[in-house]
Design a protein with these regions (language model features):
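A glycine-biased, small/acidic residue-tolerant capping/turn segment at secondary-structure junctions
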Residues: 312-333
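A short core secondary-structure module
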Residues: 155-204
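Glycine-rich flavin
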Residues: 20-164, 193-195, 344
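Solvent-exposed alpha-helices and their adjacent loops that cap or buttress functional pockets
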Residues: 121, 138-139, 160-163, 174-175, ...
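Predominant activation on well-ordered alpha-helical scaffold segments within soluble catalytic domains
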Residues: 58-62, 85, 89, 257-268, ...
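Glycine-rich beta->alpha junctions and the first turn(s) of the following alpha-helix
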Residues: 194-196, 206-289
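Amphipathic, small/basic residue-rich leader segments at the start of a protein or domain
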Residues: 1-78, 273-276, 283, 290-307, ...
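A generic structural signal for well-ordered coil/turn residues at beta-strand boundaries
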Residues: 125, 141-143, 164-166, 177, ...
Length: 356
């Protein structure tokens, strides 16, 4: 477990390169994958492993985001920890309870092996999560991915870290539930479920990797599966359901931490920005200081909407911009902090109803 919050980009980076120092660049090794062993070494997954608080993880993200390359790296890390790690933690908790009740020593075997991706000494593995689909309108009931006769078909339109992932946690629709299945990408490893014929594999998995203009080093994936073979052991969680709100709120809170880190250099030039940054930092530290263990949806919703507006307005004033939407003209990464997606707006309305 790491006890320091030294900036990893400055400590391990190579000037002029997005990769760690002494890293042999290879087209087969992506940006996040090249850094993950260092992130493990420096304790960035310690929260998942139960070694530190969620606040300590957030502080690490802020320090990492102080460097331009670090914003992309912090985003990749926080998505894997919050979303893939959140699913894995929830599934492990449920299956350990079942193991205790049923006295079944094999209940958590598959999940235990997945945890090696966050521990030192193992091979580098990356997990991503597929939820968003074309036309789903952020509503789980509108997902069209299904499993029939142990074959999964569907399209996920925006899988963050997907182009580097070894395994994708795929959320589907099944009656009134949203099970999560493991999908192993054949580019990165042998998948025993897949037909060995290359033409069949290419028909079962159709991929399109892409980047966005913000955090451009983060890879995203659109993936279509057509009768992809699924075994019962690939079911990692019986119902994603309400967990989705917790994971999205964690993502948004982590974006608060990225914002705190990203604008540090600007805060050294502008007193108003510095004052608002310190206020936001103090709010985060006090809010999460009250959290013991994993912050669940109810706890996170109690602090939502997270108070980033004053800091964003201070940045606008610093650059003489009309609104936070214009911050992207200074740096595309600022799009991360203007939350207009349907799901976040739904959360805002949910909080308003709770207060009324």
């Amino acid at each position: 477990m790491s006890g320091t919050n030294e900036n990893l980009i400055l400590k391990y980076g190579e000037p002029g390169s997005i990769y760690p120092r002494n890293f042999t660049q290879s087209a087969a090794v992506g940006f996040y994958r090249s850094w993950k062993p260092i992130l493990i070494q420096e304790g960035y997954y310690d929260f998942l492993l139960g070694f530190e608080s969620y606040l300590e993880f957030q502080k690490k993200l802020s320090v990492l985001a102080e460097e331009p390359v670090g914003v992309s790296l912090a985003l990749s890390c926080m998505v894997e920890v919050n979303v893939a790690g959140g699913i894995l933690s929830h599934a492990t908790r449920i299956q350990r309870e079942e193991q205790s009740e049923n006295l079944n020593p094999n209940a958590v075997g598959v999940l235990d092996s997945l945890w090696q991706a966050f521990r030192a000494g193992g091979s580098t593995k990356i997990f991503a999560v597929g939820v968003s689909e074309p036309g789903w309108e952020t509503k789980l009931r509108k997902l069209s991915s299904t499993v029939k006769d142990e074959k999964l078909s569907g399209t996920k339109s925006f899988i963050t870290n997907g182009a580097e992932a070894d395994i994708i946690f795929w959320v589907i629709k099944s009656e009134e539930k949203n099970p999560v299945y493991l999908v192993r990408r054949y580019q990165n490893q042998t998948n025993p479920n897949l037909n060995s014929d290359a033409s069949d594999i290419s028909n079962q998995m159709i991929e399109e990797s892409f980047h966005t203009d913000f955090t451009p080093l983060v890879t995203h994936l659109k993936l279509t599966l057509c009768e992809y073979p699924i075994s019962p052991e690939d079911l990692v969680l019986e119902n994603y359901g309400k967990l989705g709100m917790e994971l999205r709120l964690k993502e948004l809170l982590s974006l608060v931490s990225l914002l705190i880190g990203k604008i540090k250099k600007v805060s050294l030039e502008n007193k108003l920005v510095n004052d608002e940054r310190e206020k936001l930092k103090l709010w985060r530290d006090n809010f999460l200081g009250n959290c013991q263990g994993n912050p669940d949806a109810d706890f996170l919703l109690s602090g939502f909407p997270f108070p980033t507006e004053d800091l964003l307005l201070a940045l606008c004033k610093h650059w003489n911009l009309d609104s936070p939407k214009d911050l992207k003209s200074m740096d595309p990464d600022y799009q991360l902090f203007v939350w207009e997606d349907q799901f976040t707006q739904m959360l805002i309305q949910k909080k308003k109803r709770k207060l009324s």
